[in-house]
A protein has these predicted regions:
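Short, intrinsically disordered N-terminal pre-domain segments
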Residues: 1-2
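Short, surface-exposed terminal/edge motifs of secreted or surface/virion proteins that either
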Residues: 17-25
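Sequence context surrounding c-type heme c attachment/ligation sites in exported
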Residues: 14
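Glycine- and small/polar-enriched repetitive beta-structure motifs of secreted/surface proteins
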Residues: 35-285
Length: 285
């Protein structure tokens, strides 16, 4: 790069020039110093926290961080309409088209991916990684990793990892979903733990369930206080409550029965509506 005339830069030998905006200085051996804003392919890059107010803000992208006011500090946003509505929010990070688009005053959110946390207004301390993750969230202290993860949630303190995990959660809080479409249909239930692909997939309002293993408690809708560990354990349970199944296919056919305990592979596998049973051992009962 060869500075010419103090107003242009000559690039290579083609003779193409680039205008130097106000606030740009060139010093021998000191490189290029930028103290204002500049434009890259139509998008404005705001530097030094000087656009238009606030401290230590960095933004790149059309309308990114355009609403920032005094008191809105330490925000980093990259992408078209990313963080557009942030006014006094502090310490937010948004990367992706429409990421954190509606956020105004909340702080310490991380949104990475197209439309991640896009309608969040006041929820704080959320982490959303993946397109549409936590898209409609208004709650706080949620962690969502994966495309569409916790897309609708308004509750708080949820953790969801995996595409479409906790996707339909609206008001449910303190849920943990790890795996593809784990707890996908959950709406308002609290305190569920689902680990494994499609575990607790159909659960809507059943609370205090623990499902560990692929498709464990997959059909459960309103059943509560169940513990199911093992692939396909309690596979058919829909409304049964307070059951314990430990082992692959344990209590697999249970639908509405309560208060059963099955320990061992295929234990109580054929039970559907019987209650207060205890079976220990492979294929017991």
């Amino acid at each position: 790069i060869d500075p010419q005339s103090g107003t242009t830069l000559t690039l290579g030998t083609s003779g193409d020039t680039v205008s130097i905006p106000s606030g740009v200085s060139l010093a021998p051996g000191g490189g290029l110093t930028l103290t204002g804003n500049f434009v890259v392919d139509g998008g404005t890059v705001k530097l030094d926290g000087s656009y238009p107010t606030g401290v230590d803000n960095t933004a790149m992208g059309d309308t990114a961080l355009d609403s920032i006011q005094a008191g809105g500090n330490h925000n980093t946003v990259i992408g078209h309409n990313a963080g557009t509505a942030i006014t006094t929010g502090d310490g937010n990070t948004a990367v992706g088209d429409l990421a954190l688009d509606a956020n105004t005053t909340s702080s310490d959110n991380v949104a990475i991916g197209r439309c991640a946390l896009t309608t969040n207004i006041t929820g704080a301390n959320n982490v959303a990684v993946g397109s549409y993750s936590l898209r409609d969230s208004t709650g706080s202290d949620n962690v969502a990793v994966g495309q569409g993860s916790a897309l609708l949630t308004t509750g708080g303190c949820n953790v969801s990892v995996g595409s479409n995990s906790l996707k339909c959660n609206v008001g449910g809080s303190t849920n943990t979903a790890l795996g593809f479409e784990a707890l996908k249909a959950n709406t308002t239930a609290d305190n569920n733990t689902a680990v494994g692909a499609c575990s607790l997939n159909a659960n809507t309002t059943g609370a205090d369930n623990t499902a560990v293993g692929a498709e464990s408690l997959i059909a459960n809708t309103t059943g509560a206080n169940n513990t199911s560990v093992g692939k396909n354990s309690m596979l058919g349970n829909t409304e049964g409550a307070s059951n314990t199944a430990l082992g692959n296919n344990a209590l697999q056919c249970n639908t509405t029965a309560d208060n059963n305990t099955a320990v061992g592979r295929c234990a109580l596998r054929s039970n559907t509506t019987g209650t207060h049973n205890t079976a220990i051992g492979v294929e017991a009962l």
